[in-house]
């Protein structure tokens, strides 16, 4: 599981930062990639990575501001050209209006897609989707227009079958191991009964990634970010600009760091950086946040972060 940032700027592109887009790479887990926001130029950014558009099967849009959606029509069109009929379906999740924006853009440009395109427009907060490996939750944020944050929870991995322990118990190898790993109670040929649950190691705890759209401080942030292994939070303003952040419905680096500290986040990644912050000023943002939450980084375009499995606490073992 990796995060790769395709755009980390705020509002409009600059020489050093493109506008918002981040890829959650789940290639080892489900052989897929999920995109969060698709600002203008995202497909150009993808060309500078190893990301293959055919691997992207879900796109999550936080809100309808242009710096988060203007790259969608071009990306969808190029995805069609690159894969033809072999391209699998793609689903876009986002606020009301996202389907109109995409469909009208494709219609007026007479763009025909070679793959199935589906939309899920968000209405209710809570569980958005669930598959064998992940749950995704969506909750409203506090921005000038409807805006959402996403919490991706990986399900726990089942423990490994303890083969050495089975050998010590003189349990015969073979198909019986499969039944024991499934947690069944098995009767052996010698009449003994063994419970598979006694021969399975501890489960490996799944990871949690929280990706937020533009927002000022709101109670839902704690709900979204609690115990996250990685929190991706906007940082449009610096420490001394709290009033500006409030007025423009954005956040400061210190507000993001305070949230991370309060809810047990493991790592904080700050994005949506204003073009006013360049060179040494970026380091100032990071330094301000680190005073509150040390494991903080201001990200730049093409930064990639591996998300390790969390260590279990003693009371979870």
Swiss-Prot record:
Top-rank taxon of the source lineage equals: Bacteria
Disulfide linkage: none
Residue sites binding Zn(2+) 1 per the record: 63, 65, 143, 214
Q: Where is the signal peptide?
A: none
UniProt-recorded Gene Ontology molecular function terms: 3'-tRNA processing endoribonuclease activity; zinc ion binding
Which residues are responsible for catalysis?
67
UniProt name for this protein: Ribonuclease Z
Q: Which cofactor does it need?
A: Zn(2+)
Query: SUPFAM superfamilies from the xrefs?
Result: Metallo-hydrolase/oxidoreductase (SSF56281)
Q: From which organism does this entry originate?
A: Ligilactobacillus salivarius (strain UCC118) (Lactobacillus salivarius)
């Amino acid at each position: 599981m990796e995060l790769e940032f395709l755009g980390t700027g705020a509002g409009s592109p600059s020489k050093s930062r493109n506008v918002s887009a981040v890829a959650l790479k789940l290639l080892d887990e489900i052989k897929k990639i999920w995109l969060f926001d698709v600002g203008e130029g995202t497909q150009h950014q993808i060309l500078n990575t190893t990301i293959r558009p055919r691997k992207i099967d879900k796109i999550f849009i936080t809100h309808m501001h242009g710096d988060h959606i203007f790259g969608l029509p071009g990306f969808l069109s190029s995805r069609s050209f690159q894969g033809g009929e072999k391209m699998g379906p793609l689903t876009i999740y986002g606020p009301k209006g996202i389907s109109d924006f995409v469909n009208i853009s494709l219609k007026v440009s007479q763009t025909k897609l070679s793959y199935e395109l589906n939309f899920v427009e968000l209405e209710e907060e809570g569980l958005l989707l669930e598959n064998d490996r992940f749950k995704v939750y969506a909750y409203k944020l506090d921005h000038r227009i409807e805006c959402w944050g996403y919490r991706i929870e990986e399900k726990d991995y089942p423990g490994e079958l303890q083969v050495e322990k089975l050998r010590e118990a003189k349990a015969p190898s073979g198909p019986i191991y499969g039944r024991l790993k499934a947690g069944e109670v098995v009767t052996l040929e010698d009449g003994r009964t063994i419970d598979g649950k006694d021969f399975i190691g501890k489960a490996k705890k799944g990871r949690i990634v929280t990706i937020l759209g533009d927002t000022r401080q709101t109670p839902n942030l704690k709900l979204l970010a609690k115990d996250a292994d990685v929190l991706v939070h906007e940082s449009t303003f610096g420490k001394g600009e709290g009033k500006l952040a409030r007025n423009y419905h954005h956040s400061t680096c210190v507000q993001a760091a305070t949230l991370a500290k309060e809810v047990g986040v493991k790592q904080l990644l700050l994005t949506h950086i204003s073009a006013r912050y360049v060179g040494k000023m970026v380091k100032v943002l990071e330094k301000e946040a680190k005073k509150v939450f040390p494991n903080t980084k201001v990200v730049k375009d093409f930064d990639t972060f591996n998300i390790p499995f969390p260590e279990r606490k003693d009371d979870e073992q």
